[in-house]
């Protein structure tokens, strides 16, 4: 009897969907190795492997069988995806073109040999970033450079602006996945893209105001206000937008700073200067990486750098990796909470994830624990442990969707009357 490897859903799924992986037709109690691999658009290879043993019937179901070794151990039905590691050190998995899938190759090999035994079965599975029917609309309105993703069904939908961090460009994969959940999501570029500025010495909030007004005025976006989703530098900019601009009902900040970092933030005649970088506080890890977690002066010391969140009427959710080594995300979230409450504002929700690092991504993205930091100009540690980080990503994804549906009046379950 030949071994077969089956996946459910078969053939294709969305990146944030769980996969059921089963092997049948093995010898009872047979030791096997499962391997998974994918290549990103730049040709970089990501791989994971895990050792398993078939049950008494010669079957192996990853939802019931623990991994005995390899890239991860224990009961981890999605471990072969989230535990992938890049062949090139410090390479972060990002999706550059959401209109094509990541193609995952899975193999079942006989035995537990490190170099791999005889190939018993293989399968290829496509992990997509746009659910069927999701619409992708490039935006060039005034100065705004963005891509808007709309759900398949007729609108209007709750609107969200999605902001990524240092590096610039236009990353669309989080917005495209969220559009499959009933939101109109606009991935917004703000530097190093198209005809936008190449650097970010000054962040002018007027640009972001134009984006907010565009999205609020879109016929497929329901009002009155919109949501913001920002990670890292995008979280910092989201806080500035919520502080200075009207029309932002809800904001999710993932590991953001409450201080301006590496650039000035300007709005009209107001300027927030960046906090001082304390170069003598940069440490080296035992792996020879820079650890910059203590390298920023506290905004409590340099109050002028503190983004004036107390002006905001936005409802906030802070998602915090407690092992973030990019900067002190938990400290920042707590200081924002204190500042808001001191000014009679609503206490924000803060969810802390132990042993989670800086880049809390949509589910199943492998942990990027170290990599090039463009402000530092060197490889730094971003923190995090693979297993707890993967748990954090799964929970954070659910939390932010629940939050936005609640705050922005998400899925309306009634049937709209025919006009």
Curated annotation (Swiss-Prot):
What is known about its induction?
A: In the liver, by peroxisome proliferator (Clofibrate) treatment, via the peroxisome proliferator-activated receptors (PPARs) or fasting for 24 hours.
Q: In which tissues is it expressed?
A: Expressed in liver.
Keywords linked to the UniProt accession: Cytoplasm, Fatty acid metabolism, Hydrolase, Lipid metabolism, Phosphoprotein, Serine esterase
Please indicate which superkingdom the organism of origin belongs to. Answer: Eukaryota
- What is the protein's major site of localization? cytoplasm
Q: What GO biological process term is on the record, naming one?
A: fatty acid metabolic process
Molecular function (GO) terms for this protein are: carboxylic ester hydrolase activity; fatty acyl-CoA hydrolase activity
Active site located where?
232 (charge relay system), 324 (charge relay system), 358 (charge relay system)
Could you tell me which residues carry Phosphoserine? 416
Q: Does the keyword Cytoplasm apply?
A: yes
Q: Does the keyword Phosphoprotein apply?
A: yes
Please name the InterPro entries in this protein's record: AB_hydrolase_fold, Acyl-CoA_thioEstase_long-chain, BAAT_C, Thio_Ohase/aa_AcTrfase, Thio_Ohase/BAAT_N
Task: State its Enzyme Commission number(s).
Answer: 3.1.2.-, 3.1.2.2
Query: Catalyzes what?
Result: hexadecanoyl-CoA + H2O = hexadecanoate + CoA + H(+); dodecanoyl-CoA + H2O = dodecanoate + CoA + H(+); tetradecanoyl-CoA + H2O = tetradecanoate + CoA + H(+); decanoyl-CoA + H2O = decanoate + CoA + H(+)
Q: Where in the cell is it found?
A: Cytoplasm, Cytosol
What pathway is it annotated to? Lipid metabolism; fatty acid metabolism
| Any one GO CC term of the record | cytosol
Q: How does it assemble?
A: Monomer.
Q: What does this protein do?
A: Catalyzes the hydrolysis of acyl-CoAs into free fatty acids and coenzyme A (CoASH), regulating their respective intracellular levels. More active towards saturated and unsaturated long chain fatty acyl-CoAs (C12-C20).
Q: Which family does it belong to?
A: Belongs to the C/M/P thioester hydrolase family.
The protein's name is Acyl-coenzyme A thioesterase 1
Provenance organism:
Rattus norvegicus
């Amino acid at each position: 009897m030949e071994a077969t490897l089956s996946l459910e859903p078969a053939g294709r799924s969305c990146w944030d969907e769980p996969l059921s992986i089963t092997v049948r037709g093995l010898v009872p109690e047979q030791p096997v190795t499962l391997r998974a691999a994918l290549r990103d658009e730049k040709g970089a290879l990501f791989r994971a492997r895990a050792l398993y043993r078939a049950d008494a019937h010669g079957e192996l179901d990853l939802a019931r069988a623990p991994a005995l070794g390899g890239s991860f151990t224990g009961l981890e039905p999605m471990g072969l995806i989230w535990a992938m590691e890049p062949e090139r050190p410090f390479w972060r998995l990002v999706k550059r073109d959401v209109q094509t899938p990541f193609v995952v190759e899975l193999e079942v090999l006989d035995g537990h040999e490190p170099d791999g035994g005889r190939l018993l079965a293989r399968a290829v599975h496509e992990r997509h970033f746009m659910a069927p029917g999701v619409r992708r609309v490039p935006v060039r309105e005034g100065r705004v450079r963005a891509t808007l993703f709309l759900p398949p069904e007729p609108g209007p939908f709750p609107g969200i602006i999605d902001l990524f961090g240092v590096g610039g460009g236009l990353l669309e994969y989080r917005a495209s996945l969220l559009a499959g959940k009933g939101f109109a999501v606009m991935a917004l570029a703000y530097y190093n893209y198209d005809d936008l500025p190449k650097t970010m010495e000054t962040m002018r909030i007027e640009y972001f105001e134009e984006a907010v007004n565009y999205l609020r005025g879109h016929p497929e976006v329901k009002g009155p206000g919109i949501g913001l989703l920002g990670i890292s530098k995008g979280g910092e900019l989201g806080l500035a937008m919520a502080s200075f601009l009207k029309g932002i009902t809800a904001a999710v900040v993932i590991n953001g700073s409450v201080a301006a970092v590496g650039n000035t933030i300007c709005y009209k005649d107001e300027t927030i200067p960046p906090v001082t970088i304390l170069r003598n506080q940069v440490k080296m890890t035992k792996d020879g990486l820079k650890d910059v977690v203590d390298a920023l002066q506290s905004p409590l010391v340099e109050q002028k750098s503190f983004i004036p969140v107390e002006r905001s009427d936005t409802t906030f959710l802070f998602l915090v990796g407690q092992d973030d080594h990019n900067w002190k995300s938990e400290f920042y979230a707590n200081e924002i909470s204190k500042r808001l409450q001191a000014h009679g504002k609503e206490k924000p929700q803060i969810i802390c994830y132990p042993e989670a690092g800086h880049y809390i991504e949509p589910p199943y993205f492998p942990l990027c624990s170290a990599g090039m930091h463009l402000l530092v100009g060197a490889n730094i540690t971003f923190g995090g442990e693979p297993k707890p980080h993967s748990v954090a990503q799964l929970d954070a994804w659910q939390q932010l969707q629940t939050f936005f549906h609640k705050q922005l009046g998400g899925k309306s379950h009634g049937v709209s009357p025919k006009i």
